[in-house]
Design a protein with these regions (language model features):
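ABC transporter nucleotide-binding domains
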Residues: 1-128
Length: 128
């Protein structure tokens, strides 16, 4: 079973000029222990796909259809409270934007460890 699987994900944005189909039928799967790179041109939907997985879309954005399965559980069916428990604890995203990306002058491990320690109570420095 895949750790993460998107099935025909469609994420749209309602605008005054109509509906923008930011993500229109994306499907992929990621097995545990594997790495997946999402590559595309600016505006191709990479960030919107990630924000859809985390259910952190702007007010006018919505998942129109499709499934986002994490450990077999459809994240689109979870309450925001349930998603809050998953975000940062089980699923995280590192964006390339300067304010949200990794600092190039700090070791990546230290930055990831900091995120783990912020989201997981009871985890030691060594475990993180």
């Amino acid at each position: 079973m895949a750790l993460l699987e998107l099935k025909n994900l469609k994420t749209f944005f309602a605008t005054k000029r109509g509906t923008v189909k930011a993500v229109n039928g994306v499907s992929y799967s990621l097995d545990a222990g594997k790495v997946l790179g999402v590559v595309g041109e600016s505006g191709s939907g990479k960030s919107v796909s990630a924000m859809s997985i985390l259910r952190l879309l702007d007010g006018n954005g919505y998942i129109d259809s499709g499934e986002i399965l994490f450990n077999g559980q459809d994240l689109t069916k979870l309450s925001m409270n349930e998603m809050y428990k998953i975000r940062g604890n089980e699923i995280s995203v590192i964006f390339q934007e300067p304010m949200t990306s990794l600092n190039p002058v700090m070791k990546a491990g230290k930055q990831v460890r900091e995120a783990v320690l912020l989201h997981r109570r009871g985890v030691s420095q060594k475990e993180a």
